[in-house]
Amino acid sequence: MNDEASKQLTDARFKRLVGVQRTTFEEILAVLKTAYQLKHAKGGRKPKLSLEDLLMATLQYVREYRTYEQIAADFGIHESNLIRRSQWVEVTLVQSGVTISRTPLSSEDTVMIDATEVKINRPKKELANHSGKKKFHAMKAQAIVTSQGRIVSLDITVNYCHDMKLFKMSRRNIGQAGKILSDSGYQGLMKIYPQVQTPRKSSKLKPLTAEDKACNHALSKERSKIENIFAKVKTFKMFSTIYRNHRKRFGLRMNLIAGIINHELGF
């Protein structure tokens, strides 16, 4: 679907097919036009694909995760041309500020921390990426989200590791937040930040009481915001299916999508 065909769609259908709101698409397009004019101030050959169609093709790639060859055929250009120009779009948008903005936390903020996995093909050195628990190879992304839904930070590891180890490697300072909510993967976090709340664990000798179960249920309900954010990220099939590309661009792409989600939520 090119830009001309998308103009016939309703706003709701545009969002479902492209992955972003129409107003967001127009704002991103304005950023690209400014960057393109600066890059080609001295003129040059006119590209076969307009900026509107280039942005549409780039978003379709992340949203649908078809191959570049298939999308390039739809737009009537060569695969290598689309790859090169799509990568320019990704880098330009991130450098122009379409990413997660660094906003300091305050004592009034409640933040949630969690990690999600993205499957990858079996690598040559498979043990570094193997999840022994879930029996597949994966990369991990850790998000810190406020109770309003703003993504504060996003950290990526291309080698599979425990949630707490990823947090320590990220060196994120969230001590300014008034309350920190996490799942059982961050049991040691309360030794660093006393305001951390994690689920209460049971054992054979000490099963959970009714009060413990109620507290865990309330915590899970309060933490649902970060699960909703991960669901928004994974509407883009690049992050919900097996990631086929080079892993070095994975963090850039996920930060770009996280920045777009923040923007559409008003942050």
Say what each PLM segment does.
Residues 50-64:
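Short, amphipathic alpha-helical "recognition" segments used to contact nucleic acids or chromatin
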Residues 51, 68-267:
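Short, well-ordered secondary-structure "scaffold" segments embedded in the functional core
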Residues 44-45, 58, 99, 140:
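Short, charged beta->alpha transition segments
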Residues 34-38, 63-67, 91, 95:
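Short helix-loop boundary/capping segments at the starts of domains
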Residues 1-43, 188:
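Charged, often Cys/His-bearing segments associated with DNA-binding zinc-finger transcription factors
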